[in-house]
């Protein structure tokens, strides 16, 4: 198993921990594939009833691995990453995100793709992609409006302004704010409470709720977002901005 994630099962809960050496949990191609593989395996495991995705104290994830993107950005890599991200988003069992510190870019989008989000007081959510000359590429433009509404979404995406835990709770991105020392325990206890309920009722309820809040043209919207994202990251402006960021 990679050093970038830890996958384990405790009682009836699958636990996926993002764990890079620097604690920032930048999402590489390999990390995303391994998260998707672990989540899919847990979804198919009859013992597992709910899944937790968590990072560390400093960050849930600071976003895409910039150095990897500078070295290797091409359509086939992106398509693979899209497929793996959607495997995470399409898990049928309830998924809980336990967020401490930064959840930026694809890290923010991964939290949005989860069903319940618990956050510590230090959590910070944002999407700085436009400053690089590109757009959110993994579902934020389609999933965020269902959570925060048009005006708040426009401000976050168009200005890149980050949102702290309190604001995220008020706008519905976060279910509850939990003191850091209790964050994982509360996520785990919630997962185990879900595990005690009948599988069919839980999983059907999740699917019905997702259907109710989703854009009826979600798949079409995601496809448009994907194509625009591919086009934007192929631009000279994006590549130069990304190279400048990698040098910092």
Describe these PLM feature segments.
Residues 1-56:
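Conserved CoA-thioester-binding segment of acyl-CoA-metabolizing enzymes
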Residues 32, 66, 81, 141, ...:
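A general structural signal for well-ordered alpha-helical segments in protein cores
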Residues 89-200:
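Crotonase-fold acyl-CoA enzyme core
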Residues 1-11, 160-166, 181, 185, ...:
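C-terminal alpha-helix plus adjacent terminal tail
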Residues 26-29, 62, 71, 158, ...:
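Phosphate-coordinating loops and pocket residues in cytosolic domains that bind phosphorylated ligands
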Residues 16, 20, 34-35, 53, ...:
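Terminal peptide-recognition signature
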Residues 33-37, 44-47, 55-90, 103, ...:
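Glycine- (often His-adjacent) and acidic-residue-rich active-site loop
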């Amino acid at each position: 198993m990679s050093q970038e994630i830890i996958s384990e099962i405790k009682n009836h809960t699958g636990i996926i921990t993002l764990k890079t050496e620097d604690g920032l949990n930048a999402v590489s191609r390999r990390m995303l594939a391994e998260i998707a593989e672990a989540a899919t395996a847990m979804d198919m495991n009859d013992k597992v009833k709910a899944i937790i995705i968590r990072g560390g104290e400093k960050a849930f994830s600071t976003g895409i691995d910039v150095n990897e993107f500078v070295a290797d950005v091409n359509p086939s890599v992106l398509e693979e990453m899209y497929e793996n991200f959607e495997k995470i988003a399409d898990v049928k069992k309830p998924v809980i995100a336990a967020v401490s510190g930064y959840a930026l870019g694809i890290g923010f989008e991964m939290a949005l793709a989860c069903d319940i989000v618990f956050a510590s007081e230090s959590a910070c959510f944002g999407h700085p992609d436009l400053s690089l000359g590109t757009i959110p590429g993994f579902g934020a433009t389609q999933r965020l409006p269902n959570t925060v509404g048009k005006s708040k979404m426009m401000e976050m995406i168009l200005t890149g302004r980050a949102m702290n835990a309190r604001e995220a709770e008020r706008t519905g991105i976060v279910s509850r704010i939990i003191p850091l020392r209790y964050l994982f325990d509360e996520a785990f206890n919630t997962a185990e409470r879900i595990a005690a309920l009948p599988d069919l009722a839980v999983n059907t309820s999740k699917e019905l709720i997702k259907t109710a809040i989703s854009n009826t043209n979600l798949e079409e919207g995601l496809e448009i977002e994907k194509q625009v994202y591919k086009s934007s990251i192929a631009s000279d402006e994006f590549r130069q901005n990304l190279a400048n960021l990698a040098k910092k």
